[in-house]
Design a protein with these regions (language model features):
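Glycine-rich FAD pyrophosphate-binding loop
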Residues: 25-44
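Short beta-strand to alpha-helix junction loop
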Residues: 62-63, 90-98, 135-154, 299-304
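Flavin-dependent oxidoreductases
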Residues: 173, 184-277
């Protein structure tokens, strides 16, 4: 017998949960179908950064700020701790400082330039050696990615009656009917597929024709740092400036990109830039790298670890690197 809903959502990560929330708050009946007992994909493996500073001015930044508002609402609901931590982009090279100063002068997002002393007051994890300045933005938030998805799913079930069906693998979609591997059937007027890379299993031909490529990120986690090395603010390095679209309008970025391509082309090859987020328990998430398409393997590359650590040590200072 089919279970009938207004909306069926495949995937219990942040994207699926967001669609479930928006549908449920409009009064629609919603079923959330997740193939594992709890979300285990990108939603739980990342920094826990809510990062409006990375989005370019216009529609995308407006969407990011709207997302920020919803995360704050989750915090007010007591679902999880949502910290208004902000972010600091560090400059250890002259070309990095030039980009930050140009970005500050653009009529885009409100930011504040910090002296090295001001940076270290807010961010003891910043490496003072060669530090030229920092750029502070107050729009970024921090959540714990390990617990966020599970907490939100529980809240959606309790507050809105969202039917969260875990350990439910959808193997086929035919029209508005979804078939689970265990024989259960679901029917919905609208179906939203948010299963991450699992979309290849449901729509392999569409993925092939779309030209989309998978992206594998790699990051590391350091153990809890001592009390004197605790901070709330997110950190990003000069390498990050070439990664996010918000900085692409800075004419000074070209010199930075050229210098990196000449000095350290291996960083471009693996899409490496450097960021840090410290969780409330003192652990530090560090990263990250980006591999695309056919370059992706199920194995971690020691070379990537070594390159990331090399760059991380230039801009961050941890009391314990274990």
């Amino acid at each position: 017998m089919k279970q009938i809903f207004d909306v069926a959502i495949i995937g219990g990560g942040i994207v699926g949960l967001a669609h479930a929330w928006m549908a449920a708050r409009r009064g629609l009946s919603v079923v959330l179908l997740e193939r594992t007992s709890v979300a285990q994909g990108a939603s739980v493996r990342n920094f826990g950064m809510v990062w409006p500073i990375g989005q370019p001015d216009g529609e995308l930044h407006a969407i990011a700020m709207r997302s920020r508002h919803y995360w704050q609402e989750l915090g007010r609901e007591g679902i999880m701790e949502v910290q208004e931590c902000g972010s600091i982009h560090l400059a250890h090279r002259d070309d990095e400082r030039a980009v930050l100063e140009e970005f500050r002068d653009l009529p885009l997002q409100p930011v504040t330039m910090l002296t090295p002393e001001e940076v270290l007051q807010r961010a003891p994890l910043a490496n003072p050696h060669g530090l030229l300045c920092g750029m502070f933005s107050d729009s970024e938030l921090r959540v714990n990615p390990r617990i966020a998805s599970a907490r939100i799913a529980q809240w959606l079930a309790e507050k809105y009656g969202v039917a969260c069906h875990f350990n439910t693998l959808i193997s086929t979609i035919d029209g508005n009917v979804l078939y689970a591997a265990d024989g259960r059937e679901y029917q919905a007027a609208r179906i939203v597929v948010c299963g991450g890379s699992d979309i290849q299993l449901l729509f392999p031909q569409w993925i092939e024709e779309s030209g989309l490529k998978l992206c594998k990120l790699h990051m590391m986690k350091a153990i809890a740092q001592p009390e004197g090395s605790r901070q709330a603010v997110h950190l990003a390095s000069g390498l990050t400036l070439r990664h996010y679209a918000s900085f692409q309008g800075c004419s000074s970025l070209l010199a930075l990109k050229s210098r990196i391509a000449e000095e350290t082309p291996e960083l471009n090859h693996y899409g490496i830039h450097v960021m840090a987020s410290q969780l409330p328990n003192g652990e530090v998430i560090l990263g990250d790298s980006h591999e695309y398409g056919d370059d992706i393997t199920p194995f971690d590359k020691t070379e990537i670890d070594e390159l990331m650590l090399r760059e991380i040590r230039k801009v961050f200072r941890l009391a314990n690197w274990t």
